[in-house]
């Protein structure tokens, strides 16, 4: 006896007006289906049974096969028919939890409450919700004793039934033996000509069982996505929830409606986030980190006391303590900064290691470089790392001073305590403790006449 989860993910999603299958549409840059699978995997170590149909191979390619058993629904004949495709993957004594690939935000504790309602004498339990506007949902029909009798789809509902505000979310937990039994009794004699999974509720009652129900804490947990408008609305609700969770952890969020978390964000104490900040992938912000407005941070670790100023883009980078980045800085993959480094406006770095206290303050490109501590890089300095075919390394020792508008043509080494004169193009190694420069001799031509316009 174990828990098996079936996720229905075969729908086309015509109203999305997209070539991408509906369950692969992104919520916080993660496919809708991936959200559901992640929650399911918190409930069981068993493979997640995922019923696919439209765009099946694309779904497999994106989601992968790790911890998942796929079942294909070749014809779209209704939710009951979809669940039948999962029958070979569970046993009679299993409890089967049925979820939907386009309902991404159901919480683990809500599903645990649902599962706790199922036992040998209560083989079926439903997740329902009461809505002010139940239009479009199947209605929960109860008798005078408030016991569930059936679910009636809106297209088949009477006028009185349409007035019911308690609706079906689609999610249920069922004992495997009874699920197979009732699925085998389904008929498609309805307005849609489909096999409704919801018809098994009436069968359960007819077999003498009570159907127990529970409800989620929030309507957002059971919201499905059928079009881009609903997807955008759910995105904003989800981001608001994530912002609220950050503030509960002590983060100062200057405007909760203008922050996007599109991955996993870990924060320390006294973190401050300004407006229009986007986090992607896996990001760690340690204590006393400040992120200015309009920054994009992806797959980065930012250590304590560091300030990221406005309009900075950081990707696949490790930033040390008490650094100062930006504004308008771009730290590309492979950037590793030690303590107290300053990267200023319009500076781009890639595949660099920069030592403690070094400064690259203005208008520079530093790539494929090992830089020591206490280095000052003047404005307009470029490491010329690419010869048209291969990338080459620049090595800069400790306490080096690079004058403005210099070009370091790799491969080249600037040894510790060296000084490079402004405007130099360095093609050979610069010795330690020396001044190295390469400039044309300055000339002042007397009697020079400025050209005049013809």
From Swiss-Prot:
It is an enzyme of class 2 (transferase). Pfam families: Hexapep (PF00132), NTP_transf_3 (PF12804). SUPFAM superfamilies: Nucleotide-diphospho-sugar transferases, Trimeric LpxA-like enzymes. Its main location: cytoplasm. It catalyses: alpha-D-glucosamine 1-phosphate + acetyl-CoA = N-acetyl-alpha-D-glucosamine 1-phosphate + CoA + H(+); N-acetyl-alpha-D-glucosamine 1-phosphate + UTP + H(+) = UDP-N-acetyl-alpha-D-glucosamine + diphosphate. Acetyl-CoA binds at residues 379, 385-386, 404, 422, 439. GO terms for molecular function: glucosamine-1-phosphate N-acetyltransferase activity; magnesium ion binding; UDP-N-acetylglucosamine diphosphorylase activity. GO terms for biological process: cell morphogenesis; cell wall organization; lipid A biosynthetic process; peptidoglycan biosynthetic process; regulation of cell shape; UDP-N-acetylglucosamine biosynthetic process. Mg(2+) binds at residues 102, 226. Binds 1 Mg(2+) ion per subunit. Residues 1-228 are annotated as: Pyrophosphorylase. InterPro entries: Bifunctional_GlmU, GlmU-like, GlmU_C_LbH, Hexapep, MobA-like_NTP_Trfase, Nucleotide-diphossugar_trans, Trimer_LpxA-like_sf. The keyword Phosphoprotein does not apply. UDP-N-acetyl-alpha-D-glucosamine binds at residues 8-11, 22, 73, 78-79, 100-102, 138, 153, 168, 226, 332, 350, 365, 376. Homotrimer. Catalyzes the last two sequential reactions in the de novo biosynthetic pathway for UDP-N-acetylglucosamine (UDP-GlcNAc). The C-terminal domain catalyzes the transfer of acetyl group from acetyl coenzyme A to glucosamine-1-phosphate (GlcN-1-P) to produce N-acetylglucosamine-1-phosphate (GlcNAc-1-P), which is converted into UDP-GlcNAc by the transfer of uridine 5-monophosphate (from uridine 5-triphosphate), a reaction catalyzed by the N-terminal domain. In the N-terminal section; belongs to the N-acetylglucosamine-1-phosphate uridyltransferase family. In the C-terminal section; belongs to the transferase hexapeptide repeat family. This is Bifunctional protein GlmU. It comes from Hydrogenovibrio crunogenus (strain DSM 25203 / XCL-2).
């Amino acid at each position: 006896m174990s828990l098996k989860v079936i996720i229905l993910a075969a729908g086309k999603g015509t109203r999305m007006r997209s070539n991408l299958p509906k369950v692969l549409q992104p919520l916080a840059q993660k496919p809708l289906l991936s959200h559901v699978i992640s929650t399911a995997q918190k409930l069981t170590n068993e493979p997640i049974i995922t019923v696919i149909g439209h765009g099946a191979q694309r779904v497999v390619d994106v989601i992968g096969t790790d911890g998942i058993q796929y079942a294909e629904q070749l014809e779209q004949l209704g939710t009951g028919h979809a669940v039948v495709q999962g029958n070979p993957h569970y046993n009679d004594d299993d409890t089967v939890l049925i979820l939907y690939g386009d309902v991404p935000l159901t919480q683990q504790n809500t599903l645990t409450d649902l599962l706790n309602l199922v036992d040998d004498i209560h083989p079926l339990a439903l997740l329902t919700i009461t809505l002010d506007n139940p239009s479009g949902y199947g209605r929960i029909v109860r008798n005078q004793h408030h016991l569930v009798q059936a679910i009636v789809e809106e297209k088949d509902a009477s006028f009185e039934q349409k007035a019911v505000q308690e609706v079906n979310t689609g999610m249920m937990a069922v004992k495997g033996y009874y699920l197979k039994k009732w699925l085998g009794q389904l008929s498609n004699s309805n307005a849609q000509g489909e096999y409704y999974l919801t018809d098994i509720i009436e069968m359960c009652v007819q077999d003498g069982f009570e159907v127990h129900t529970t409800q989620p804490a929030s309507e957002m947990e059971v919201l499905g996505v059928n079009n881009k408008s609903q997807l955008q609305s759910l995105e904003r609700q989800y981001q608001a929830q994530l912002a609220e969770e950050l503030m509960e952890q002590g983060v100062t969020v200057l405007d909760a409606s203008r922050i996007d978390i599109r991955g996993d964000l870990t924060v320390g104490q006294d973190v401050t986030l300004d407006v229009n900040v986007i986090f992607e992938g896996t990001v760690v912000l340690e204590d006393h980190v400040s992120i200015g407005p309009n920054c994009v941070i992806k797959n980065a670790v930012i250590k304590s006391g560091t300030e990221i100023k406005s309009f900075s883009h950081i990707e696949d980078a490790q930033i040390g303590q008490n650094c100062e980045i930006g504004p308008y800085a771009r730290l590309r993959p492979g950037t590793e900064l030690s303590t107290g480094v300053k990267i200023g406006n319009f500076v781009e770095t890639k595949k660099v290691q920069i030592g403690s206290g070094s400064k690259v303050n203005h208008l520079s490109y530093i790539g494929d470089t090992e830089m020591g501590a206490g280095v000052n890089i003047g404005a307009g300095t470029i490491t010329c790392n690419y010869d048209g075919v291969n990338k080459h390394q620049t090595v800069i020792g400790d306490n080096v001073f690079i004058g403005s508008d210099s070009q370091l043509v790799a491969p080249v080494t600037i040894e510790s305590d060296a000084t490079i004169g402004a405007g130099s193009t360095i093609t050979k190694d610069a010795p330690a403790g020396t001044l190295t420069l390469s400039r044309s001799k300055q000339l002042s031509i007397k009697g020079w006449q400025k050209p005049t316009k013809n």
